[in-house]
Amino acid sequence: CLADKLDMVIPELSEFIREENCTYSKIYSSFCEYCNVFSEPVHLCGLSLGAVLALNYAIDFPQKAGSLVLIAPQYDMPKFLLKIQNVLFKFMPESQFKDIGFCKKDFITLTNSMADLDFTRELDRVKCPVLVMCGEKDKVNKKAAINLTGKLTNAKFVTIDHSGHEVNMDNPQGLVKAIEMYGDMVNI
């Protein structure tokens, strides 16, 4: 079991969000402060925004990234999709955002601040092993995840069956199995 091999810390993304702190750059800065406290290389696993943060960290701190598990990642933000998404968000009730730890206004601010993110030219800085995953039904992120895998020098792509974007909710057993198999392959 991977949990027996590693000291695991599982921060909640909302821990990096403070009042008036809902831009990507501010959340990323808080995330870096958190990760840089650890003296050993960190093994990062992130879903969606968490995957973007983990990838960004491995680019900026390649010596500190031991491995990455990126679930439903984007490396070049789909600007048009984000704009459509933000229009839809404006019509959604505030209650829809509570489960993800954001208020509606802050979530819209965050997604707007991410529109210009593009790590394409910096992907060669990622030196650690990377497992890229996507749910088989995640039509929005699957192509980007497959493309990202091809652009990284030490990456493997896995599709998680019977799941959409929230792989951890849709097929937690499949997710754990894929991570543990990958951990064994790269000797984590």
Task: Show which residues each predicted segment covers.
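Catalytic histidine-centered segment of alpha/beta-hydrolase-like enzymes
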Residues: 20, 163-172
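Flexible "cap/lid" loop of the alpha/beta hydrolase fold
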Residues: 24, 52-55, 59-60, 67-94, ...
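Hydrophobic, aromatic-rich cap/lid helix
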Residues: 95-121, 137
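Short beta-strand/loop motif that positions the catalytic acidic residue
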Residues: 126, 132-134
